[in-house]
Amino acid sequence: MTDTLFDRRDIDALLGGRHPDPFACLGPHGEAGRTVVRALLPGALRVRAVTPGGDELGALACVDEAGCFAGTITHDGRYRLAIDWPDAQQVTDDAYAFGTLLDDAALARFAAGDPAAVLDCLGATPIRVDGVDGVRFAVWAPNAQRVSVVGNFNSWDGRRHPMRLRRPWGVWELFVPGIGPGEHYKYELCAADGSLLPHKADPCARATEAPPRTASVVADTAALDGFGWHDAGWIDARPDAGRRFRVPWSIYEVHAESWQRVPEEMDRSATWDELAERLIPYVKGMGFTHVEFMPISEYPFGGSWGYQPLAQFAPSARFGPVDGFARFVDRAHAAGIGVIVDWVPAHFPNDAHGLAQFDGSALYEHADPREGMHPDWNTCVFNLGRNEVSAFLIASALAWARRYHVDGIRVDAVASMLYRDYSRKEGEWVPNVYGGRENLESVAFLRTLNDALHGAAAPAGVVTIAEESTAWPGVTAPTGDGGLGFDFKWNMGWMHDTLAYLHEDPIHRRYHHDRMTFGLVYAFSERFVLPLSHDEVVHGKGSLAAKMPDDAWQRLATLRAYFGFMWAHPGKKLLFMGSEFAQWSEFAHDGTPHWDLLDAPAHRGVQRLVRDLNRAYASEPALHALDCDAAGFTWLIGDDRDNSVLAFARRDDSGRVVVAICNFTPVPRSGYRVGLPAPGQWRELMNTDAAVYGGSNAGNDGAVWAQDVPAHGQPWSATLRLPPLATLWLAPA
């Protein structure tokens, strides 16, 4: 009789991994006045149904030696399965005794592109259902024939836990009782053609194994969401849209994996708690306002530096448990330091366990390689025109802002998103619906992203920054005015022009003077960050110090002068780790900055200069309040190419003023007249040639007096001694 309790067609479909609805046959089913319980437990020797208290309700007979069991019970309440395995016994609730888990309305919102629905529905969530603790798994895979969740809890056997398809929305769900946070898992998917795919990590995993292992990990979401934050005052004080452009931003860019290692433990990377002990005091002591991390969401290949992530919701396990990052941010905020994370929505790697061909189809990426493959990085390009993909990515950004309290999101590779022909030759790209090269889906996505991060869905005060290297108009213009809606944009043109100028021998700089002045032609067309980032100190480009010509003294002097120019120039500041003490070697992701250079006075001097520049920049409103407003800048000397001298005034709207004078030759210049906007004594606020910074200590004895001699469009002026390869800042005494 037992063979009639389990239809042969169901058995064959389940064992073949192609059953369209496992809940239709597995679990309890009322039939002809009785309850039939069916279970698929490959490898089990004996199965019984028992009450929660352990009383036996009935045996489930083996109806197929591959692991199909069935039996009848008269009990109509909760039951459990008592399973005898070859080497163990187990008592567990039946995963197929629970009803649907996800709300239809929430799934409909997900299909419509609502990021909040991604956060509410997808991933692995420890929950209690009908008094039973377990984990709800949910994954989007609309084109799969079958999806199972696999892990240590079922010996990674995809036959054990096939999931329920919520067909209209393409989401598969299953509640697995008796497991919880810390459980390792993946998904086993059978493609529409019946082929078995490699096990896939959860796209919405909140935690992962440390590479090179690739499993997802069930995170304690209740603990994460209930983390004991102490930064309410910091969050409340974050500047709103009207003020955030008027405050100082000096950003220290960090590769968390290599900033400082632990040599006693095989040079492993520091954990978040260790970084909190070391990095936060360092950033604070150096006067930086923010730390920006290169991508920290989980990434399989260390050589990508994080720019090929595969777990957009999970801090990398390289740095310890995910709540360690929350503790880091909390401690940074307590120290007055903001935290920015790099975030990568442009592309993803094609690792077998990742998003590529996730359900056997081009689900997250474009199917056409002219749209779906990035030629520079051999990575997959997100299909941002698909509601679910857009919602997935925006939900990730919101999760970093909401769950981890980050202060800013820097969006990587925006230019590659905006142009359909980016790095593609003729015939290798697909025009938009109007025949143009603009990627209209990316434009819509970026606007939606910025509106979400600046709206009610995110905590107040979250800032967005674009790495955008072209002249696309309105990157920082409001979305309502047709812009992309970013708060800031990296000024890549300024960086390339000024570094190219400084690479020239000083005797030739006169022929390239425009490279130092051209940036002011467009400096206020967008709100800019001046980035001396990791991209400029890798792949044979040399470190900042190594880019400068001549001997070591002149190289460091030129770098100091450049820093003085940069910190006085309109725009927020960003400096990559190691550059603050003039490291000679390039960035090496598998190494660490050469901290031993700080044993040398010359390198300590550069580090001290950066500290003092940061402090002066932050304390002097004239240097930051109108960073994004043309009213805050006046050229005094922009055309002295023969002497390679520049001079300009920075001011705030109250009338405070700082004048910067730069001499980019090794020739000291005495009696050099510079126009000044006010009479009286002017003190040297900064001299990058000071002895404490490793310079020759030339200058003006700390102060000059303005004379009633008009010059450079100003009613007063002073004659100065310009130190070699140096920048001076003057402020009214």
From Swiss-Prot:
Keywords: Carbohydrate metabolism, Glycogen biosynthesis, Glycogen metabolism, Glycosyltransferase, Transferase. SMART domains: Aamy. GO terms for cellular component: cytosol. GO terms for biological process: glycogen biosynthetic process. InterPro entries: A-amylase/branching_C, Branching_enzy, GlgB, GlgB_N, GlgB_N_E_set_prok, Glyco_hydro_13_cat_dom, Glyco_hydro_13_N, Glyco_hydro_b. One of its GO terms (molecular function) is 1,4-alpha-glucan branching enzyme activity. The active site is at 412 (nucleophile), 467 (proton donor). The keyword Nucleotide-binding does not apply. It is an enzyme of class 2 (transferase). Pathway: Glycan biosynthesis; glycogen biosynthesis. Its EC number is 2.4.1.18. HAMAP family: GlgB. Belongs to the glycosyl hydrolase 13 family. GlgB subfamily. This is 1,4-alpha-glucan branching enzyme GlgB. It comes from Burkholderia vietnamiensis (strain G4 / LMG 22486) (Burkholderia cepacia (strain R1808)). The lineage of its organism: Bacteria, Pseudomonadati, Pseudomonadota, Betaproteobacteria, Burkholderiales. The gene is glgB.
